[in-house]
Design a protein with these regions (language model features):
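Amphipathic, heptad-repeat alpha-helical segments
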Residues: 28-63, 100-111, 118, 202-246
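Long, contiguous interaction/targeting segments characteristic
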Residues: 31-99, 323, 391, 474
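A domain-start/cap signature at the N-terminus of enzymes
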Residues: 108, 163-168, 172-320
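Contiguous beta-strand segments within globular domains
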Residues: 111-135
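Short substrate-entry loop that stabilizes the transition state in hydrolases
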Residues: 315-320, 325-364, 446
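Gly/Ser-rich "nucleophile elbow"/oxyanion-hole loop immediately N-terminal to the catalytic nucleophile
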Residues: 317-318, 365-394, 408-410
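Glycine-rich nucleophile elbow surrounding the catalytic serine of serine-hydrolase chemistry
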Residues: 392-402
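The feature captures the conserved acid-bearing segment of alpha/beta-hydrolase catalytic domains
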Residues: 413-486
């Protein structure tokens, strides 16, 4: 069994807090804070991608503080430090006075999902963290609702004073779609853009949600009856589980519960409606839908399930390679799609025609292993079992080790970034049969574990490559290592 020797104190504290939060969910920071932190992380990562080496080096200090703040659940302070890093990644010694006065503000909009009959949107700006400077009195906000083509559906301009106390914007009825809310603050010649939000409008939302919930109950009952009778399930377990989880998700949106990220609610509903309507044509539905959107599928094996987010490659007749990506502590199935280089890992895999599967894992690990996930995926996609790859960051790197221990014959390449650990002697030769790429930042608290893993593999005669990245800490290691990671993966699966 994998033996992780030195778990950092900050991670132990985080895991303890997570355990408490399971019992006391109302006593921990809400999903709205997680979502806002993710938006600021994306903004920073986009700037870091374009930054010069000296600018990247200047980001290390605030990033370390941001990670420490995150693990101690001081999310507002983590956001402040990410914004300091964002400023430095842009080569600014000091942001403009206007930016300093508004950068700490958070946009709240409700309802993010409603019927097309809904004619208003409640909007508010409130501090995500406090700033020393205050916005000028003449600050105004421009709001625009844009459809998928970029066409403007509604727009307005309001004084900041009104939005700080919450205001109902009468948008009128909006067409059906997953729209974008674009916001810009302005004072004289100074302006500041807030990251967009998704605003979904669905025709007949209540009726369609009720129908989905009814189908969810039918799928659950059908699965239970057929299992009891040892019959062949007519509803694939993954389809039934996906319908149930989507119905739960949409119900939470209808109740105005905060989510951890932007979700295309209409697209997720329509996927499930297609799965219900087209019955056994699961592969066709997913292939068609997967060409224009990510797929949130709940993979199932018996009663055990795992939430995943999946990116499909372009349609092809040949079976496709599969890349499993495992997020770090505090993340979710959305992490690799929206962070870790603002989603660049997913983009690079898509370029190469690989199916990307990002499973959610909690503090107790994965509820399904890669073998069980592959079985579930084979009912939905044509996959190439001879080209299965694993990539993990931090806690996800430990998950790569765990999957290698459980199913050493499956992965053809393994990547561990910002994590690892010492492995028992009895497991080393099993691990060593697969090529590895292991990396960490010179300023990364996970570096020690990564080096331990690499050295264990080398001592067993394994094929392991290790790389340190200068001026890189724990948060940015995936983004820093993307090019080397994909060169390794592409070369390895082409040789095997």
């Amino acid at each position: 069994m994998c033996k992780i020797v030195h778990l950092p104190v900050r991670v132990r504290v985080f895991l303890c807090v997570c355990c408490i939060s399971l019992a006391c969910p109302d006593q921990v920071p809400g999903q709205a804070q997680r979502m806002e932190l993710g938006r600021r992380l994306q903004r920073f990562e986009n700037a870091w991608e374009r930054a010069e080496p000296a600018e990247r080096s200047a980001c290390v200090g605030p990033l370390k503080t941001a990670v420490s703040s995150f693990f101690s659940l001081r999310l507002s302070e983590a956001g402040r430090q990410l914004d300091v890093a964002w400023q430095r990644a842009r080569g600014l010694d000091m942001a403009s006075e206007f930016e300093q006065s508004v950068v700490g503000l958070q946009l709240i909009a409700q309802p993010v999902c409603a019927d097309t009959e809904q004619q208003s949107l409640k909007i508010q700006l409130r501090p995500f963290y406090e700033t020393v400077k205050q916005p000028p009195p003449d600050t105004r906000l421009s709001f625009r609702l844009l459809d998928a083509s970029g066409a403007c559906l509604a727009e307005t301009s309001l004084p900041l004073s009104a939005v700080l106390s919450s205001v109902d914007w009468m948008t009128g009825k909006l067409s059906e779609g997953d729209h974008r809310l674009s916001v810009q603050l302005q004072s004289g010649a100074d302006s500041f853009v807030i990251p967009d939000l998704t605003i979904s409008r669905i025709a007949g939302f209540s009726e369609r949600l009720a129908a989905l919930q009814k189908n969810s109950e039918k799928a659950a009952a059908s699965s239970a009856l057929e299992k009891a009778a040892e019959a062949v399930t007519t509803v694939p377990p993954t389809v039934g589980a996906t319908i149930r989880s989507t119905a739960t998700f949409l119900k939470s949106l209808s109740e105005a519960r905060s989510q951890e990220t932007d979700f295309p609610a209409l697209a997720r509903l329509e996927l499930c409606e297609d799965l219900v309507a087209e019955g056994a044509a699961v592969t066709e539905v997913l292939s068609r839908r997967g060409q224009s959107q990510d797929l949130w599928l709940t993979l199932a094996n018996g009663r055990r399930t795992v939430a995943t987010r999946i990116r499909c490659p372009e349609l092809t007749q040949a079976p496709v390679p599969v890349l499993f990506v495992f997020h770090g502590a505090g993340g979710s199935e959305n992490m690799f799609f929206e962070a870790y280089g603002a989603g660049r890992v997913i983009q690079e895999a898509e370029k190469r025609g690989w199916l990307v599967v990002a499973p959610a894992q909690g503090i107790l690990g994965l509820s399904l292993g890669i073998q069980e996930m592959l079985v579930a995926l084979e009912s939905c996609f044509s996959i190439d079992r001879n080209r299965v790859m694993l990539l993990g960051h931090s806690m996800g790197a430990a998950q790569v080790m765990r999957q290698m221990q459980l199913h050493p014959e499956i992965p053809k390449a393994a990547v561990a970034l910002g994590g690892g650990g010492q492995i028992r002697e009895s497991d080393v030769k099993t691990f060593a049969a697969t090529p590895w790429f292991i990396a960490a930042g010179k300023e990364d608290f996970g570096r020690r574990g990564a080096i331990q893993l690499h050295q264990s593999l080398l001592e067993a005669g394994g094929n392991s490559r290790y790389k340190d990245y200068e001026d890189v800490e724990h948060l940015v290691i995936v983004q820093a290592a993307i090019d080397d990671t994909f060169q390794f993966l592409e070369t390895t699966i082409s040789e095997r």
